[in-house]
Amino acid sequence: MTRRRSRPSGGAGRRERARAAGLQKPQAPEPQPPPPSLEAGAGAGPPEVPAELDCDGPREEEEPKLAPGPQVPPTSSQSVQTCCLLCHRERKGWEEGPSQNGLVLQGEKLPPDFMPKLVKNLLGEMPLWVCQSCRKSMEEEERQTGGDHAVAISLSHTSCKSQSCGGDSHSSSSSSSSSSSSSSSCHGNSGDWDPSSFLSAHKLSGLWNSPHSSGAVPGSSLGSPPAILGEAFPVSEHHQHSDLTAPPNSPTGPPPHPASLIPSHPGSFSSASYPPPLPTTPVAPFPAQASECPMAAATATHPSGPCQSPHPPSTSMPLLKMPPPLSGCSHPCSGHCSGHCGGPLLPPPSSQPLPSTHSRDPGCKGHKFAHSGLACEADEGLGEEEDSSSERSSCTSSSTHPRDGKFCDCCYCEFFGHNAPLAAPTSRNYTEIREKLRSRLTRRKEELPMKGGTLGGIPGEPAVDHRDVDELLEFINSTEPKVPNSARAAKRARHKLKKKEKEKARLATEALKQVNRVSGSQEPRPARERLLEWPDQELDRVNSFLSSRLQEIKSTVKDSLCASLSMCELSVESSGFKEGTVEAQTLTPSDLSGSSQKRPDINLDLSPLTLGSPQSHTLQAPSEPVPPWAERRDPHPPPWTEVRGPPPGIPENGLVRRLNTVPNLSRVIWVKTPKPGNPSSEESSKEVPSCKQELSEPVATGGKPKKSKRQGSQAKKTLASPAPWSPANLEASGAKSQVSSPKQPSKGSEPAKVGSGAEPGEGSPGSRPGPIQADSPKTDKKGSSWQNWPGGAKARTLEQESEQTPGPARPQSLSQGKGRSRRSRNKQEKSASSLDDVFLPKDLDGVEMDETDREVEYFKRFCLDSAKQTRQKVAVNWTNFSLKKTTPSTAQ
């Protein structure tokens, strides 16, 4: 309050000085106003501080500065020079672009960023910049100078000084030093304002100046603050800050400011009355400067709060009403800038110093809307009213003037203001705003207790609850309270319950799914999924069964292998072959075609049992279907077991041998996979003469068209080359499936015995590991199957190697006597090459093949690659592990 009072008193002196200086300054500054505008823009900010600090000194400095123009004014009367210079500059620039001080020219568009800052700055700056004395000085300077530059400079300096005298100009000029005190007191936001904000304010002031130039002298007052703004945004900003500070203080002590403003403003007012002519005169001689000067004058008037006062009535008005002067200031701004909406808007910020807060917000807009002094006065009244309700008034003022409705009271945003005044309304009367806020808070607090009371059951006594403890506990624990708070609790409880229910449902569904998976999940699942899972399930089933039956099978296989080995050594293949190929012999009568047809079935059975069987089939020309069968086996492990039925079929001696040698295994497989099982094999054997029948039957019996097709293809191959099969069977199928064609039962019998002994081994291990290692049937046949069956597998491998050698012989030879395998190899040197043909994939290019054969070749490739990889991985990994174990330090 003391600061404000001192400001007013100092402001009065300053304004008087400014007036005197204004008279003096205009002459010197006339030539220099344009340069000062440049310098003021740069250096106005700092000079303002001195102006504020020393009312007289700054005045004097301002006068000299006004004379030098841009250079001197920025320092001492920076606000004045800045306003004038900036007004000219900014006015020109702002006229070019959107007015950024919240005062938007009718044809201008304000950038959203500048709107708030400009509004705030203008609200703060316009009152500070536009002191009555400054206005008068500006007007007088304009008149005397006859040049817009001189008038603008003097007015700007005068306005700055008068503003400081009013506590606005000096506060603004000393905003650097005194912005915290006088400036901050004038404008609580002054500290917050940035030079950029000032720039926007300057731009706004420039806009105002353009309107002011077109408008009345009050506009020239405003123009002076814009000039300061243009001169140095910091300076104008300081002025604005003082104004902005003043608005907060002005709410605190609006009367002191009005008083101080009034005294200084009276001079201002007298000069304010001049400003109208000045703007008019400057407009004619120098429209740009005239408008700027009018803006400065308006600014000076606004700070005084008698922006209206600038008019004789407005002078009395500021004294009468502090808020009205603010609104009055804004009004004079609008009156001065009546032509320029932006002008009035900016002036309210300038007038903001004390009343300027009010005038800045609604007053400015209202005044803006009122483009004449009368309108300003009317706006003054409105300004007071608006001051009382700055927010509402700001909106009202904006509503009064459509152009002014671009700024919002709270954030000064031009878009959401819906005709809200500039920043002035919020900043101009902080006391009223605070009171409103307090009242609102009080109402809310009252409403809250009412709500609490309703919760408690008694709206008036929310804290008191007469319910029993049990009731209270129930209420607290209840999930469905009817009270508002309880409603929230009930909501939460409901949400929790829903979540729990959802969780339970999800868990139940998951459990059901798991149960279905474990028990009958396949049934609900689509047939495709079931089929996909079927192989794995069958593999597990077969593996478990094989493991359980392993010992029995091993013993049986060992016996059969021993018999077959002895038979091979003694070259007594008939017995072994008969045993191993009882069904094979049956097929032999059925001819190669029949045997070949059965072979596919056997291959299907044996391949699932032992990967070696597909290999042996591969060895045979028609054995290619065996790999397809193996493929089927891979996708459908149960089919392999199903194929077990065909083993009785004699398609491949090895397979038949396996089945005969390991009848239990074949039976087990049969039991596990009864689909293709015996029916398929039996039917195939029965229908051996016709491959088509065999194929169709395996499909129907086995229920797996793939295998039946492959079998059929194999049968077709065998039928196509029945003669080759007799030798090819001995050689090609010598490895595993030496299908002793009916033509060559003796030769085939020996390999068949060995194959039967070895292949049963293969078959048993193969069927067991085969399902497990379906990916690499060859490897499983040779290595994994026999390795899995150390005893029986070895015997089998020996027999197979002796008879079949190449495919199964390799793993068999590795597992058991290589000598026997060598003997068999010697016997089957030709079959060795055939083994490569069988096991190694053939070039599919340029070769005519069935789809089944092609699938077999693909399967061979797959098996070969997988087998190699598996072997390499095992060897390398085991070696590394062993090395690491032996040398733990190295391993580490």
Curated annotation (Swiss-Prot):
GO terms for cellular component: cytoplasm; nucleus. Residues 28-37, 248-258, 274-285, 309-321, 637-650 have a biased composition (Pro residues). Residues 1-78, 164-192, 237-321, 379-403, 587-655, 671-837 are annotated as: Disordered. Residues 56-65 have a biased composition (Basic and acidic residues). The modification Phosphoserine is found at residues 764, 776, 882. It holds the Pfam family FAM193_C. Residues 587-597, 610-621 have a biased composition (Polar residues). Disulfide bonds: none annotated. Keywords: Coiled coil, Cytoplasm, Nucleus, Phosphoprotein. Residues 485-517 form a coiled coil. Belongs to the FAM193 family. This is Protein FAM193B. It comes from Mus musculus (Mouse). The lineage of its organism: Eukaryota, Metazoa, Chordata, Craniata, Vertebrata.
